């Protein structure tokens, strides 16, 4: 290879890679400068990269209000923005029902704990972690045409799709949850994802897990099962019709 030179690096840290991003100027249609806003950055990291294994740190400003009439004080500190360790990567022995319920209510914006959860880890032809929930109540738009089924799909802790409909059959469209697989590419398109063999295997396994969980509820906890059925029975009666 011709046309290159090697020289001493004056980087103070000495190691690692620095990536500098430059934003385009704002236009009438696009306000790129919003991506420099502290809360916007925090929100994007929380949504897409909350569960990657490495810390994402940023200098964060906090405003402290003192006595009335005095100027507020602004303090800056380097903070880690992401959680790093997702609940579905933890061992079941480390977790209580309260942990599962709190995650569900925070993640999916529900004020009521789910009827049941399914925490599974699969290795082999398709390697993945899954945490599924059977809600105690239907979303307000569940029986409307606007409702979109799907599970949150992650690749090594990075969310690649917020609602992957191909992971759930229509008769289990009420199930909420996350699936995380290292076998899926981060930049896979929606079209290729629909044809992905790994995804089809995962979907088949999840359907079986949901069936088994509902059968277990029916046998061991009739009260919970009847609560579930009273909410979602219209789905099955309409399908039968």
Regions found by a protein language model. Name each.
Residues 186-220:
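Extended, well-ordered alpha-helical scaffold/bundle regions in very large, multi-domain proteins
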Residues 61-65, 120-124, 191-196, 227-232:
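A glycine-rich phosphate-binding loop feature that marks nucleotide/adenosyl-phosphate handling sites
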Residues 236-241:
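Conserved small/polar residues in nucleotide/adenosyl-binding loops
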Residues 36-53, 165-187:
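Hydrophobic/aromatic-rich, well-ordered segments within soluble, folded domains that form packed cores
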Residues 39, 68-177:
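GHKL/Histidine-kinase-like ATPase module
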Residues 1-70, 77-80, 155:
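GHKL-type ATPase core
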Residues 16-26, 78-84, 148-156, 180-189, ...:
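Short acidic (Asp/Glu) and glycine-rich catalytic loops that position anionic groups and cofactors
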Residues 167-174, 181, 208, 212, ...:
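Charged, alpha-helical coiled-coil and linker scaffolds that mediate dimerization/oligomerization
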């Amino acid at each position: 290879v011709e046309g290159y030179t090697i020289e001493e690096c004056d980087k103070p840290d000495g190691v690692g890679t620095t990536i500098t991003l430059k934003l385009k100027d704002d236009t009438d249609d696009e306000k790129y400068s919003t991506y420099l806003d502290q809360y916007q950055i925090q929100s994007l990291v929380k949504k897409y990269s909350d569960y990657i294994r490495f810390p994402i740190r940023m200098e964060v400003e906090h405003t402290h209000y003192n006595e009335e009439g005095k100027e507020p004080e602004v303090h800056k500190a380097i903070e880690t923005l992401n959680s790093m360790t997702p609940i579905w990567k933890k061992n079941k022995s480390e977790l209580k029902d309260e942990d599962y319920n709190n995650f569900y209510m925070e993640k999916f914006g529900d004020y009521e704990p789910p009827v049941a959860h399914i925490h599974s880890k699969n290795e082999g032809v398709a390697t993945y972690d899954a945490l599924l929930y059977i809600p105690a109540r239907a979303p307000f738009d569940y029986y409307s045409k606007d409702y979109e089924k799907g599970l949150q799909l992650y690749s090594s802790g990075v969310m690649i799709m917020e609602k992957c409909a191909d992971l759930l059959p229509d008769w289990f469209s009420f199930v909420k949850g996350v699936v995380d697989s290292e076998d899926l590419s981060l930049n896979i398109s929606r079209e290729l994802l629909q044809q992905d063999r790994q995804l089809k295997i995962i979907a088949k396994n999840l359907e079986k897990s949901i069936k088994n969980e509902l059968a277990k509820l029916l046998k061991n906890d009739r009260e919970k099962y009847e609560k579930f059925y009273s909410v979602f029975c219209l789905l099955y009666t309409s399908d039968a019709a």
